[in-house]
Amino acid sequence: LKKMAQEAGVVLTGFVKGHKLHSLLTNARCYCLPSSHEGLPIALLEAMSYHLPVVVSNIPANLEVGLSSDCYFHCGDVDALAARLQKVIDEDYHSVQYDMAPYDWDKIAKQVMGVYEGLLK
């Protein structure tokens, strides 16, 4: 699989962080998350913060992010995934503007603090 991906120009990274992650996301054409299980998909949110087109499975955690329907494919449907990726590749590249306000760390921290303060009363 890794050899086939490399020949096709696909990068299968595994876990990365820091400068390497920044370099990958800065130079990526799109971000794909075909997971069948996720919690809050932080990697997806990171890709969105780089304004990348995204292609993600329609599992509940990804659906909660609230992307446009053309970003999703039915989990496990390899043909649908391939078609969606091909569409992204065939389109002229453009950065995508996402509503990231719900994922603002300062806002989230204040909400969590409010929960703890409420518990202490």
Model-based region annotation:
Residues 1-16:
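Nucleotide-activated donor-binding/catalytic signature segment of Leloir-type glycosyltransferases, i.e.
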Residues 16, 23-28, 112:
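Short alpha-helical donor nucleotide-sugar binding micro-motif in glycosyltransferases
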Residues 34-36:
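Aromatic "clamp/platform" in nucleotide-sugar-dependent glycosyltransferases that forms part
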Residues 41-44:
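Short glycine/serine-rich donor-binding loops of glycosyltransferases
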Residues 53-56:
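Short hydrophobic beta-strand element within catalytic cores of glycosyltransferases
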Residues 59-72:
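Short acidic/histidine- and often glycine-rich active-site loop of Leloir-type glycosyltransferases
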Residues 71-78, 86-90:
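Conserved acidic donor-binding segment of nucleotide-sugar-dependent glycosyltransferases
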Residues 92-120:
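A charged, aromatic-enriched C-terminal amphipathic alpha-helix characteristic of glycosyltransferases
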